[in-house]
């Protein structure tokens, strides 16, 4: 994440917190980010310097006025005016990071060799909440190369309980063992 994204995303969070709009702005940013991720040509158009700023601002108004909070629309216009609209995704990440910190939320991804049943995901979430004392937002992903077990991806570290990891550890130990 760039310094620009941290600065702008943090400033937007500060404003939203001051106005008690954290949840609404978070939802709007997620929606805008999803649309821009799905429509890279639209983002490219909004970032094209040969298109006058007023025209780009008009395109933003046309697409988003009434669909997102005015703070989000004005934030997008500010990024557009400053030539940093491509940083919106990073700004949204920083906003989410600040939101999670303020609301004691920890995002965790469980990576497994096969898809976990919903009841197992719920048990894992409950166990993580009990251990961390935070609300866990758990997502999952399948990676067949893991063979078995679970890899937990947290913002600041990974907890690797996969079969692949343990096999690599055994291999490393055997390589370093003198017979």
Predicted regions: what they are:
Residues 1-179:
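Elongated, mostly alpha-helical coiled-coil "stalk/stator" tethers of large membrane protein machines
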């Amino acid at each position: 994440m760039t310094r620009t994204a941290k600065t702008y995303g943090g400033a937007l969070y500060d404003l939203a917190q001051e106005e008690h709009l954290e949840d609404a702005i978070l939802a709007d940013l997620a929606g805008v980010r999803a649309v821009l991720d799905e429509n890279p040509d639209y983002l490219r158009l909004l970032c094209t310097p040969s298109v006058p700023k007023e025209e780009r601002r008009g395109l933003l108004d046309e697409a988003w006025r009434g669909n997102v909070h005015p703070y989000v629309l004005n934030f997008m216009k500010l990024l557009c005016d400053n030539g940093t609209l491509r940083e919106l995704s990073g700004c949204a990440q920083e906003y989410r990071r600040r939101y999670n910190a303020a609301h004691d939320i920890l995002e965790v991804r469980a990576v497994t060799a096969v898809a976990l049943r919903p009841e197992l995901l719920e048990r894992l979430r409950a166990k993580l909440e009990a251990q961390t004392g935070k609300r866990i937002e758990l997502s999952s992903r399948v990676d067949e190369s893991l063979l078995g077990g679970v890899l937990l991806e947290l913002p600041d570290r990974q907890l690797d309980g996969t079969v692949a990891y343990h096999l690599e550890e055994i291999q490393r130990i055997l390589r370093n063992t003198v017979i």
